[in-house]
Amino acid sequence: MPTAYLTRIVEFTATHRFPNTPEFAGATSDHSHRYRCAVTVKGVFDPARGGVMSLPVLKSLLQREVVGRFDGRHLNEDIAPFSEGKWVATGEALALHVWERIAAALPAGVGLHCVRIEEGANLYAEYRGDT
């Protein structure tokens, strides 16, 4: 059976800040983004089901684990591991964090292919798992 991919995009607004170090010059104060998060799942195409997994199930999962978790929040203050000081709240780190939450909640037989976090029209980060 062929492998198929399904991508769902959600949006949320969140605030973050970077440490006052040379690599983050100019972005060390609190600032917000209207993030777009694209999550792509993969699995065996099931002709009887019409695809990889139920779209309402994926939509509900993203609503709970992404929008419900991050929308209106301050990443550095409200969301572990950022609030614990373990990770810097970058797009790359956010993509990895979303990956960890979504991968653990997918139905059997469905895998995660990519998490893409867009901070704006000209900046995005992707995580595709450890390869």
Place the predicted regions along the sequence by residue.
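Charge-rich, low-complexity N-terminal segments
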Residues: 1-131
